[in-house]
């Protein structure tokens, strides 16, 4: 179970002073003009049950990426609580956080990057490689994914060619 309760991310100095004060009720431009701060995530709460598919949707600039980055602690929330399978994610140490990111958390970045010195198969199989999966298995699994998304003809070109060719697939 993932549980997010009262999660806030305020960018700027003295961000904590915004939460629970009349400043939190200001519009974005008003808050920015008065304090220099920006509220990116405002008092978000939800639970995701095991096996449940949960989608974060919203307009551009509404805080979706910031919310997910807070959930994975790529950026630190300003306030709130975040638990995963009963564990307080905001209290885990760096080693535990790294392990959770490696084995339990994932996100697809809005502007992802390919490793230009690797071919398409090796880019796709990279996460398997850093998790210690042998090369033959990595490539077999990467080929399954390539077949699944209909990009079999783009397995070996340089990544930029793959990105352009498969973006319309």
Predicted regions: what is each one?
Residues 117-125, 158:
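Short coil-to-helix segment of the ABC ATPase nucleotide-binding domain corresponding to the Q-loop/switch region
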Residues 20-30, 85-88, 129-132, 136-154:
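Conserved ABC ATPase "signature" region
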Residues 31-38, 90-106, 130, 135-139:
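ABC ATPase NBD coupling module
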Residues 57-59:
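The feature captures the beta-strand-to-loop junction immediately N-terminal to the Walker
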Residues 158-166:
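Conserved ABC ATPase signature
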Residues 72:
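Helix-to-loop junction immediately C-terminal to a conserved catalytic motif
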């Amino acid at each position: 179970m993932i549980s997010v309760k009262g999660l806030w991310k305020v960018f700027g100095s003295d961000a904590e002073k915004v939460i629970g004060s009349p400043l939190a009720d200001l519009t974005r431009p008003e808050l920015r003009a008065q304090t220099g701060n920006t509220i990116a995530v405002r008092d978000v709460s939800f639970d995701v049950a095991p096996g449940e598919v949960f989608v974060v949707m919203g307009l551009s600039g509404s805080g979706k990426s910031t919310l997910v980055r807070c959930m994975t602690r790529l950026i630190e929330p300003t306030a709130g609580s975040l638990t995963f399978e009963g564990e307080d994610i905001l209290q885990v140490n760096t080693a535990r956080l790294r392990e959770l990111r490696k084995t339990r958390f994932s996100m697809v970045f809005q502007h992802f990057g390919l490793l230009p010195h690797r071919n398409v198969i090796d880019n796709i199989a990279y996460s398997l490689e850093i998790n210690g999966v042998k090369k033959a298995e990595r490539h077999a699994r990467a080929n399954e994914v390539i077949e699944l998304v209909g990009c079999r003809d783009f397995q070996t070109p340089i990544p930029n060619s793959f990105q352009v060719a498969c973006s319309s697939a």
